[in-house]
């Protein structure tokens, strides 16, 4: 009984901390990030396409790496992965959530009428024009 109470208390405290540390955006705050996203998202999209298409030798390199083999594409691939991860980290560090990089779809947690929702942005929109409930996704977008 004691360990269950302690575990439950720790879990609830962790949940409360996560909720308290989660960033919520006003429409104005979220819109202030759009110019940066308009620059970064196309770069991320290009890198994602490149990682999926331009490195056919990587699968073989991964298999050979088990036996100390390698690939001429290895260094280029790792550089692309590092750039991709760096840009994704910058976007996520803002506090927004990447929902689909191929579509250029990013959500900003927000509070609307006392409940948590997402301000929904999609490339190449110049500002956030839509929002949706947490469980409806892009299909549930509503005009602001």
Regions found by a protein language model. Give the residues of each.
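Glycine-rich, aromatic-bearing surface loops/beta-hairpins
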Residues: 89, 93-144
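Amphipathic coiled-coil alpha-helices
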Residues: 40, 47, 54, 61, ...
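Long, hydrophobic N-terminal alpha-helical segment
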Residues: 2, 14-61
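Interaction interfaces in information-processing and related assembly proteins
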Residues: 65-68, 79, 83-89, 100, ...
């Amino acid at each position: 009984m004691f360990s269950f109470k302690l575990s439950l208390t720790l879990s609830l405290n962790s949940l409360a901390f996560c909720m308290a540390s989660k960033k919520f955006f006003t429409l104005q705050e979220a819109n202030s990030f759009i110019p940066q996203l308009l620059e970064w998202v196309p770069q991320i999209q290009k890198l994602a396409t490149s990682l999926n298409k331009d490195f056919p030798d990587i699968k073989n390199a991964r298999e050979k790496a088990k036996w100390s083999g390698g690939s001429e594409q290895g260094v280029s691939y790792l550089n692309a992965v590092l750039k991709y991860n760096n840009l994704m980290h910058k976007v996520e560090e803002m506090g927004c959530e990447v929902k689909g990089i191929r579509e250029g779809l990013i959500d900003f947690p927000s509070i609307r009428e006392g409940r948590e929702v997402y301000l929904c942005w999609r490339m190449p929109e110049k500002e956030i024009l839509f929002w949706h409930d947490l469980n409806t996704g892009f299909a549930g977008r509503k005009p602001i």
